[in-house]
Regions:
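Structural beta-alpha unit
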Residues: 1, 76-109, 208-241, 247-250, ...
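Aromatic/hydrophobic pocket-lining residues that form π-stacking "cages" and hydrophobic walls in ligand
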Residues: 19, 23, 75, 99, ...
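A short acidic, glycine-rich active-site loop
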Residues: 56-70
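Short, small-residue-enriched loops and turns at beta-alpha junctions
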Residues: 117-118, 188-194, 220-223, 249
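Small/aliphatic-rich secondary-structure junction motif
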Residues: 1-55, 132-135, 145, 149-218, ...
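Short, flexible loop segments at the rims of nucleotide/cofactor-binding pockets, characterized by
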Residues: 12, 86-90, 115-118, 158-159, ...
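Gly/Ser-rich helix-loop-strand patches that form or flank binding pockets
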Residues: 20-29, 96-146, 233-275
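Short coil/turn segments
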Residues: 68, 141-143, 159
Length: 275
């Protein structure tokens, strides 16, 4: 399987954002099409509060139009320079909801790490996309200066549905990686009805898809799961971390602080999440 349609979130009119660069660098070797989705929340709120023809709404639309056009020109220029097909779309509303909706008609969603972690509604856009879209979501750190197609991949594997979804979603990268390191954590408890489990060695799957696969036992018991995942990724000199989003319920993880939130908070390499 190969990605053919990649969706990237555009939330700024600046010429460069790491998410755009990451989407383009992944699209090039795959021959993929990139859609830039520019989201506008303030205008949506004004339309809902006052209506589309109210003075405040019309003034906001007039202010936004040149910024939107500038963002489109910059995006199309980046795609043209890279020799890939780029498409443009503008939507109004909550960014995570818009991205999830459009993302389901794409193979991959690429979003940038939220500047302060949260949007104006107290929601992490990247985290919401990873959990609610049903589509593999690549989250790119704000501090990233340049991007290239990932060559050294670390996969966090704990035999869960979430880690399986993330791994399968990342296969187009895993299959092309020069090295894949798998951090194998604690196995999930089986139900009481299982008296003899089937063979379930993740190395068998990865050796069928990738070359140079290394299996490394991973024990997070001595510290935070997320922090130790990032430390292990750095030791492997990884340029991509693949992991499941949420190993517990969202509410429980919000209260206790789990691997997902720890990684999101301290993100300094791109991470591909699946739920």
């Amino acid at each position: 399987m190969s990605w053919k349609r990649i969706l990237v979130h555009i939330k700024s009119y600046r010429d460069y954002t790491p998410a755009i660069d990451a989407a383009i660098q992944i699209a090039k070797p795959l021959g993929a099409h990139v859609t830039g989705l520019y989201t506008m929340r303030e205008l949506a709120m004004l339309k809902l509060m006052f209506g589309p023809d109210h003075k405040a709404t019309l003034e906001a639309a007039a202010r936004d139009q040149p910024l939107t056009e500038k963002a489109e020109r910059a995006f199309r220029a980046r795609c043209e320079a890279a020799g890939i097909v780029g498409d443009w779309d503008v939507a109004e509303g909550n960014a995570s909801e818009l991205l999830s909706l459009a993302g389901r008609c794409h193979d991959l969603i690429v979003v940038q790490q939220s500047a302060q972690g949260l949007d104006d509604l107290g929601t992490d856009i990247a985290e919401e996309c990873a959990v609610t879209s049903g589509v593999p979501t690549l989250i790119v750190p704000n501090a990233t200066k340049s991007q290239s197609f990932p060559k050294r991949v670390v996969v966090a594997w704990n035999h869960s549905r979430q880690s399986a979804a993330a791994l399968r979603g990342a296969m187009p990268i895993v299959e092309r990686a020069e090295r894949v390191t798998v951090l194998v954590g604690e196995k999930r408890d089986l139900t009481s009805s299982v008296t003899k489990a089937p063979r379930h060695d993740i190395a068998e799957l990865l050796n069928a898809h990738a070359t140079n696969v290394e299996i490394v036992p991973f024990d997070p018991s001595t510290g935070g799961d997320g922090s130790r995942l990032l430390e292990a990724a750095h030791r492997a000199n990884a340029d991509l971390l693949v992991m499941g989003a949420y190993g517990r319920s969202a509410w429980r993880e919000f209260l206790l602080g789990g691997a997902t939130r720890q990684v999101m908070k301290n993100l300094d390499i791109p991470v591909l999440m699946g739920h």
